[in-house]
Swiss-Prot record:
Keywords: Cytoplasm, Phosphoprotein
Cell compartments where the protein resides: Cytoplasm
Gene from which this protein is expressed: Ccm2
Summary of the tissues where the protein is detected: Highly expressed in heart, lower expression in kidney, lung and liver (at protein level).
Residues annotated as domain PID: 59-248
UniProt xrefs under Gene3D superfamilies: 1.20.1160.20, Pleckstrin-homology domain (PH domain)/Phosphotyrosine-binding domain (PTB)
Record note on domains: The C-terminal region constitutes an independently folded domain that has structural similarity with the USH1C (harmonin) N-terminus, despite very low sequence similarity.
Residue segments, region Disordered: 1-36, 401-432
Function field: Component of the CCM signaling pathway which is a crucial regulator of heart and vessel formation and integrity. May act through the stabilization of endothelial cell junctions. May also function as a scaffold protein for MAP2K3-MAP3K3 signaling. Seems to play a major role in the modulation of MAP3K3-dependent p38 activation induced by hyperosmotic shock.
Organism: Mus musculus (Mouse)
Origin superkingdom: Eukaryota
Protein name per its UniProtKB record: Cerebral cavernous malformations protein 2 homolog
Annotated spans, Harmonin homology domain: 292-385
Length: 453
């Protein structure tokens, strides 16, 4: 009987009733899986480099890009050179060997990167639970590294930006798996930073993401320098007899203004990422170090501040007190909605032919959306670089920003580690900062009325 029973159970033969039941169950499982993986469309734009988005889109809105989130490495030495492919891959490989970063990427690692002028936010693609949020002023550098078939985008940030130290270091630990902390025990007591590791589907997607971040850095830099210019004008026009100095207001809404200006102290590097001689491409790297502490960064920041001081002192030597007040009034009108064309024409009339070269010094303070019109205006009136120290300095300074897409890594400039101090980064803090600038200029207008009376 047992033998007959065994003979009856032939392998590969399934009862018709069981086949129908299994087919129905598989169909239900497939539909359930499709329901789970159904994803909303992203709030995004498609760029064809070197195309750029409207600055207002980043200031008042946000852009989403799909990435794969590998994880976050903490306690990385602050002296890490973000433009060095070898150094970055050293830490990534070490983390993979210790299972802190995934060796193989799956659908579970899919994430959404949300980018604005205030912060970078990462959330899981399914469920959209927030992984971390990094304020822009906590980002020291952005690098693109090609590792075989993987296209990695790495953010060098302040230690534990936007998350508590107890949170996970990588995608697996965020999903409930255990993971330790990556630390270089051989390194002495140096400031630490973090590396946020992401992957994109292609080189084009990685470069597009880096381009967007580069534009964010430039927008933040422009707003910060305009703030400095407004304060410097207010300082020089309202009290023309005392020595001009740049300062940060002591109020809570105007902190770390010098640190914000430091963003321009370092470089944005965009090396050619094509393969050379069979070697992997160098990283596509952008650096902005709002809180850097190295000597070279400090010197660069001092130099940038001195350029601004020199320009304001030049205005005081070339313009009368009344003309400086007129300049402040024109700037106030421009910041409150006047067109760049009106601003340029009015400044041209104020400066006259003999002083029109002073317009070159305004280059770093013109918002990106108006920069092309400003450059065209300079060409129209015959203003070129090379008219003295001030104009040369500002001319070189502006070109360094405008030609980032073709510059190469020099390998000698490193980024100091950002510290973990807080600074205004959310929308309300940003709005209050801009409002404070307008208030300063309005106060300048009141002092002008009193002087004329």
């Amino acid at each position: 009987m047992e033998e007959e029973g065994k003979k009856g159970k032939k392998p590969g033969i399934v009862s018709p009733f069981k086949r129908v039941f299994l087919k129905g169950e598989k169909s239900r499982d497939k539909k359930a899986h499709e329901k789970v993986t159904e994803r909303r469309p992203l709030h995004t734009v498609v760029l064809a480099l070197p195309e750029r988005v409207e600055p207002d889109r980043l200031l008042s809105d946000y852009i989403e890009k799909e990435v794969k989130y590998l994880g976050q490495l903490t306690s990385i030495p602050g002296y890490l050179n973000p433009s060095s492919r070898t150094e970055i891959l050293h830490f990534i490989d070490k983390a993979k060997r210790s299972h802190q970063l995934p060796g193989h990427l799956t659908q579970e690692h899919d994430a959404v990167l949300s980018l604005s002028a205030y912060n970078v936010k990462l959330a899981w693609r399914d469920g959209e639970d927030i992984i971390l949020r990094v304020p822009i002023h906590d980002i020291a550098a952005v690098s693109y590294v090609r590792d075989d078939a993987a296209h990695l985008v790495v953010l060098k940030t302040a230690q534990d930006p936007g998350i508590s130290p107890s949170q996970s270091l990588c995608a697996e630990s965020s999903r409930g798996l255990s993971a330790g902390s990556l630390s270089e025990s051989a390194v002495g007591p140096v400031e630490a930073c973090c590396l946020v590791i992401m992957a994109t589907e292609s080189k084009v997607a990685a470069e597009e993401l880096c381009s967007l971040l580069s534009q964010v850095f430039q927008i933040v830099y422009t707003e910060s320098t305009i703030d400095f210019l407004d304060r410097a004008i207010f300082d020089g026009a309202s009290t023309p007899t005392h020595h001009l100095s740049l300062h940060s207001d002591d109020s809570s809404t105007k902190v770390d203004m010098k640190d914000s200006y430091d963003a321009d102290a370092s470089t944005f590097c965009f090396p050619d990422s094509g393969d050379v001689g069979g070697l992997p491409p160098l990283p596509f790297c952008m650096q902005t170090s709002p809180h850097s502490k190295t000597v070279s960064e400090s010197e660069l920041s001092t130099s940038a501040t001195e350029l601004l001081q020199d320009y304001m002192l030049t205005l005081r030597t070339k313009l009368s007190s009344q003309e400086i007040q007129q300049f402040a009034a024109l700037l106030h009108e421009y910041r409150n909605g006047a067109s760049i064309h009106e601003f340029c024409i009015s400044l041209r009339q104020l400066y006259g032919d003999s002083r029109k070269f002073l317009l070159l010094g305004l280059r770093p303070f013109i918002p990106e959306k108006d920069s092309q019109h400003f450059e065209n205006f300079l060409e129209t009136i015959g203003v070129k670089d090379g008219r003295g120290i001030i104009t040369d300095s500002f001319g070189r300074h502006r070109r360094a920003l405008s030609t980032t897409s073709t510059s190469t890594i020099n390998g000698n400039r490193t980024t100091g580690s950002p510290d973990d101090r807080s600074a205004p980064s959310e929308g309300d803090e940003w709005d209050r900062m801009i409002s404070d600038i307008s208030s300063d200029i309005e106060a300048l207008g009141c002092s002008m009325d009193q002087d004329s009376a």
